[in-house]
């Protein structure tokens, strides 16, 4: 869409932040309201009642999320800025996200890369970030591996195999070839939250978390195969000596996206990693938008946010801060696609 032409008809004093009512929407909309922006939640039929309980949400619209384009005209008339997150990627789909006729905060084109596991790894490799070994031929597997399906499904459908024989048996039971086989790296998981600011021209390391996954983090007692469906998140603070490496990876990723997926990273994104016992960091995934792990800091702010703003701020507030200050500096077009 022609963002510049659309913004000419916007009343920039009456912007409305719009997002799908799921994932990190409460954090996003609360942050928008705190910064004086209007707020709209687009909910699946039957789920809007929950979001109507919160007075920081001005309007809750229930609609089949696959038909969200039907709302675009009215939303644009009301100066809408769409904030994508994982549920938007999953339920609306990356193809619709690319063509959605609503100005979108962030780089909407990275969503296509995020939806494809092979393109994901290619982008990380291009950035020069250490990644796990991948196997194109299942018969060549010589170590424990994890099989990952494409799409933002919160880890649903992923599984582990200890060797090539076990892998062959498990692959025969799935009905898709849209997956990658990746070395299962042993270590501590850590998920890093970044914000690429066009207002301040910097990449901010804004926080980090651990995922709590069912049932690999539950009580298996050898009664079930481990699965990786995300059920929640846990705050994390890293030892300070690791922070320069994490910052460098975030900046390297931002540079790679600028080269391969113009106009580059805008706003929140995440690198997902394993920290090995030698303290080396291997990155196995990225998310090109806000991640649900940022919810652990909602209302209290990440401890790292004070390093930039001298006050705690959560990612929802950070997004709103960027929008408001982009308007003040005449840079709103620089944070939208």
UniProtKB/Swiss-Prot annotation:
<dbReference type="InterPro" id="IPR011761">
    <property type="entry name" value="ATP-grasp"/>
</dbReference>
<feature type="binding site">
    <location>
        <position position="272"/>
    </location>
    <ligand>
        <name>Mg(2+)</name>
    </ligand>
</feature>
<keyword id="KW-0436">Ligase</keyword>
<comment type="pathway">
    <text>Purine metabolism; IMP biosynthesis via de novo pathway; 5-formamido-1-(5-phospho-D-ribosyl)imidazole-4-carboxamide from 5-amino-1-(5-phospho-D-ribosyl)imidazole-4-carboxamide (formate route): step 1/1.</text>
</comment>
<comment type="function">
    <text>Catalyzes the ATP- and formate-dependent formylation of 5-aminoimidazole-4-carboxamide-1-beta-d-ribofuranosyl 5'-monophosphate (AICAR) to 5-formaminoimidazole-4-carboxamide-1-beta-d-ribofuranosyl 5'-monophosphate (FAICAR) in the absence of folates.</text>
</comment>
<keyword id="KW-0067">ATP-binding</keyword>
<dbReference type="GO" id="GO:0000287">
    <property type="term" value="F:magnesium ion binding"/>
</dbReference>
<dbReference type="InterPro" id="IPR013815">
    <property type="entry name" value="ATP_grasp_subdomain_1"/>
</dbReference>
<feature type="binding site">
    <location>
        <begin position="144"/>
        <end position="191"/>
    </location>
    <ligand>
        <name>ATP</name>
    </ligand>
</feature>
<dbReference type="InterPro" id="IPR023656">
    <property type="entry name" value="IMP_biosynth_PurP"/>
</dbReference>
<dbReference type="InterPro" id="IPR010672">
    <property type="entry name" value="IMP_biosynth_PurP_N"/>
</dbReference>
<dbReference type="Pfam" id="PF06849">
    <property type="entry name" value="DUF1246"/>
</dbReference>
<dbReference type="GO" id="GO:0005524">
    <property type="term" value="F:ATP binding"/>
</dbReference>
<dbReference type="InterPro" id="IPR016185">
    <property type="entry name" value="PreATP-grasp_dom_sf"/>
</dbReference>
<dbReference type="GO" id="GO:0016879">
    <property type="term" value="F:ligase activity, forming carbon-nitrogen bonds"/>
</dbReference>
<keyword id="KW-0460">Magnesium</keyword>
<keyword id="KW-0547">Nucleotide-binding</keyword>
<protein>
    <recommendedName>
        <fullName>5-formaminoimidazole-4-carboxamide-1-(beta)-D-ribofuranosyl 5'-monophosphate synthetase</fullName>
        <ecNumber>6.3.4.23</ecNumber>
    </recommendedName>
</protein>
<feature type="binding site">
    <location>
        <position position="213"/>
    </location>
    <ligand>
        <name>ATP</name>
    </ligand>
</feature>
<dbReference type="InterPro" id="IPR009720">
    <property type="entry name" value="IMP_biosynth_PurP_C"/>
</dbReference>
<dbReference type="GO" id="GO:0006189">
    <property type="term" value="P:'de novo' IMP biosynthetic process"/>
</dbReference>
<keyword id="KW-0658">Purine biosynthesis</keyword>
<feature type="binding site">
    <location>
        <position position="23"/>
    </location>
    <ligand>
        <name>5-amino-1-(5-phospho-beta-D-ribosyl)imidazole-4-carboxamide</name>
    </ligand>
</feature>
<feature type="binding site">
    <location>
        <position position="233"/>
    </location>
    <ligand>
        <name>5-amino-1-(5-phospho-beta-D-ribosyl)imidazole-4-carboxamide</name>
    </ligand>
</feature>
<keyword id="KW-0464">Manganese</keyword>
<keyword id="KW-0479">Metal-binding</keyword>
<feature type="binding site">
    <location>
        <position position="285"/>
    </location>
    <ligand>
        <name>Mg(2+)</name>
    </ligand>
</feature>
<feature type="domain" description="ATP-grasp">
    <location>
        <begin position="121"/>
        <end position="328"/>
    </location>
</feature>
<dbReference type="Pfam" id="PF06973">
    <property type="entry name" value="DUF1297"/>
</dbReference>
<feature type="binding site">
    <location>
        <position position="87"/>
    </location>
    <ligand>
        <name>5-amino-1-(5-phospho-beta-D-ribosyl)imidazole-4-carboxamide</name>
    </ligand>
</feature>
<comment type="similarity">
    <text>Belongs to the phosphohexose mutase family.</text>
</comment>
